[in-house]
Structures are given as structure tokens and as C-alpha cells.
Amino acid sequence: GRHLTNRQATSIIALLIGVLASLAAFSLHKLIALIQNLLTNDFVADSFNWLYLVFPVVGIWLTMLFIRYVVRDNISHGITRVLYAISTKQSKLKAHNCWTSLVASALTIGFGGSVGAEAPIVLTGSAIGSNLGRLFHMSNRQLMVLVGCGAAAAVAAIYKAPIAGLVFTLEVLMIDMNM
């Protein structure tokens, strides 16, 4: 039988990572909207509601409890963590990073916290790339490319801007995408 070349296998896995990272970005967007809707659905639009001042504090508190008692690991500094994983030439990110940053940021943003979705979704997409690549026993070089694919797909999906995802990966993460 005919076997796939390394380049073909990496391309197929990269496509799968792109789909999964895009689904993660979509899930984050929908989860934020769901939380916001649940919290503010009954509010009257033209009057002051003091809960707008309380919700961000509650969201940060819930996020802190989630990180301390469920995750039990530091999930902050998403982009810095990805850069560190790439710079060590290992490109290894923990499996829980495929979902924990997503849940924590959805809680914080959904409750009105003033944080962005970029760092958590970059960490999520990169972790998907890293863990799927390791599942298929890819080399460190291929893992680095797959981490970049996950980051690019996640940024492209969260901002609905495919070129921005690619530019982010090439410029900020400085990943050489040659296989």
C-alpha cells in the first residue's frame, strides 16, 4: 500500500487542528453570549442597573474558583506560554489548555470583565495543535508548525479574519511555517 509522506500527514493534521481551533473559537463566542444573555435578559435597557457593577466581580471570583479548584494550574499569560513552549523547541502545551482557558475567559468576559479573548483563544488553539501533534507522534519541528496552525486558526476564527490569523502567527509567534 501507499503511505502518506510527512508533509501530507502534517497537512491533514493541520486541517483537523484548524477545524477544532475554529470550533473552540465559535464555542467561546457562543458561551460568552449565553452567559451575558442569562445575566442581562430581564434588564430594562433605559434604566440604571447596579448589577452591571457586581457581575464583573462575581465573574472574576467564579473564574478564580474554577482555576483554583478545577484546573489547579496557572493558565494566565496565554501568548507568553505559547511563546515559551515554542522557544524551548518542544512546543508542548498541557492537554487541559485545550479547554480551561476557554471556560475561564468565557466566565470572565461573560460576566462583564474587561479582558480580551485573544490570549485565551491563542492558548486554546495552540494547545489543540500541540496535543493533537503529540497524539500522532509528530517531530518537534512538525509540532511547532501545528502549534502555529492552531494559533492562526483560533485568531482567524475569533476575529473572522483569516489573514490576521496567519500574520499573527508569523509576526507575533515568529513561527517558520516551512515543513
Where are these regions (language model features)?
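Alpha-helical transmembrane segments and immediately membrane-proximal extracytoplasmic
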Residues: 1-179
